[in-house]
């Protein structure tokens, strides 16, 4: 009986991690054909924002320059000029097709993310008692660690997320969020966020150390300061 009670929260933890993802993935596959059909039959006009329009124009200009360079190498003839126009036409259609696919992926990502968040929220509310048990296990585990181990864990977390080598990780995380939400990444915005977010989190973390850890466990703070120095 005790083993069963201990197994239930672990099963709940595994299900809360994988079940929302599995359901949203299944819904994504079910909606994919419907969204594709709706987009291809119901959309008579392609709507682009400034970033998407700029990206598409840059790709088109690059393609046009490459095709023009290829034709410059050959002899100019009426046949080659016709082939040049046909090549631009085909590649333009391909670029528009890719843009359509990106728009459909944006709709699917947005829909499945809403479904995933709704399932996760509902599952968390319904399993509140199991979350309390998991929280007590985590607190007990941390309580049994030595002060040195706790200080090392704090150092590992801060170095991983806020260290001098963390900007590539922040950039990857921000790009992943952009892709999941289905928004086209803006390089300037990403650069600004990579510069600002670590500073904000580092300031909040240091305030937490000064405000709470000083009174809760001065020994951990002392060990942490000694290691960082």
Swiss-Prot record:
Entries under Pfam families matching the protein: CemA
Sample GO molecular function, one term: proton transmembrane transporter activity
InterPro entries assigned: CemA
GO CC aspect terms: chloroplast inner membrane
Recorded superkingdom: Eukaryota
Subcellular location: Plastid, Chloroplast inner membrane
Key words, A-Z: Antiport, Chloroplast, Hydrogen ion transport, Ion transport, Membrane, Plastid, Plastid inner membrane, Potassium, Potassium transport, Transmembrane, Transmembrane helix, Transport
One GO term (biological process): potassium ion transport
Membrane topology: Multi-pass membrane protein
Transmembrane stretches, start-end: 7-27, 107-127
Record keyword Nucleus present: no
Known catalytic reactions: K(+)(in) + H(+)(out) = K(+)(out) + H(+)(in)
Family: Belongs to the CemA family.
HAMAP family per the UniProt record, alphabetical: CemA_PxcA
Purpose of the protein: Contributes to K(+)/H(+) antiport activity by supporting proton efflux to control proton extrusion and homeostasis in chloroplasts in a light-dependent manner to modulate photosynthesis. Prevents excessive induction of non-photochemical quenching (NPQ) under continuous-light conditions. Indirectly promotes efficient inorganic carbon uptake into chloroplasts.
The name this protein goes by in its record: Potassium/proton antiporter CemA
UniProt organism field: Solanum tuberosum
């Amino acid at each position: 009986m005790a083993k069963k009670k201990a197994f239930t929260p672990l099963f709940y933890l595994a299900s809360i991690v994988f079940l929302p993802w599995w359901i949203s993935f299944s819904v994504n596959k079910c909606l994919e054909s419907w969204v594709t059909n709706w987009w291809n039959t119901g959309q008579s006009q392609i709507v682009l924002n400034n970033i998407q329009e700029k990206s598409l124009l840059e790709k088109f200009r690059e393609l046009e320059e490459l095709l023009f360079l290829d034709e410059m190498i050959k002899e100019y003839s009426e046949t080659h000029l016709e082939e040049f126009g046909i090549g631009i036409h085909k590649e333009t259609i391909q670029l528009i097709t890719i843009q359509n696919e990106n728009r459909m992926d944006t709709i699917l990502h947005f829909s499945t993310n809403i479904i995933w968040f709704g399932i996760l929220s509902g599952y968390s509310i319904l399993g509140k008692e199991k979350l309390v048990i998991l929280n007590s296990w985590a607190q007990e585990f941390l309580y049994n660690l030595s002060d040195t181990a706790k200080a090392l864990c704090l150092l590992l977390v801060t170095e991983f997320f806020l260290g001098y080598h963390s900007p590539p990780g922040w950039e990857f995380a921000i790009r992943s969020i952009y892709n999941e939400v289905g928004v086209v990444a803006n390089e300037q915005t990403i650069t600004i966020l990579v510069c600002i977010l670590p500073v904000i989190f580092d300031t909040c973390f240091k305030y937490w150390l000064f405000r709470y850890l000083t009174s809760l466990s001065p020994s951990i703070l002392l060990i942490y300061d000694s290691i960082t120095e």
